[in-house]
Amino acid sequence: GRLNLTVPLATVLGLADRPGEAAGIGPVDPWLARDLAAAAARNPKTTWCLTITDQHGRPIGHGCARPAPATDPAKRATLGTRAGPDPPPADAQPGFTIGREHGPPGGYGTWRLTTGIPGAPDLIVTVEPISTDPCDHRREAPGHDPGLMLRHLAQIRYAICTGPACRRPAAQADFEHNTPYEAGGRTCLCNGDPKCRHDHRVKQHPRWQVDQLPDGSVLWTTPAGRQYTTEPTRYPI
């Protein structure tokens, strides 16, 4: 199985002792989070992503790592120092630095991830914006089903189901249109979010009303007229 671990960058770099969070489990103390990140760095199957937040912890930018290109000078230098079969050091720590590229327009630049493992190539992370108010529709899908990146960004913006009081991880939920696609709703971050199968069915009940507000909040109105609001995830910062 896989574990989705979210850790503040300051904790990973040893600049602060702020807790992380394991999806579906809960908070992780900073020392364990740092150890888990170091262990993940030693596993070549680990997938790395970087999320930029605002001052409140809400996600405003995101990107996932890819190997540095073969023409990258830093990668060539790294490959030239490969240490053969020696095991990686147990205390190796991953680190991020700002890359040379600016990334896509309106984004947050390109970052370089070094895992701290001798001989391991660097990874490149290009961070694109998670548009909020207004939405730029850059990842809008032309049909009913979202693309992989749109689905992923929705799961970053909302780490859990947006149903009131639901805690199911977004990776185990459906991408659901708040304004139905058949009624002209866009397949876009401004009109879709993760809903578990139960809340997906509740939302489709004709006596329930669900609206996504410009700031990303989701307003649920019950048949009795009561209203409940869920907000985009606030990450530890």
Feature annotation, model-predicted:
Residues 1-237:
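A boundary/linker detector
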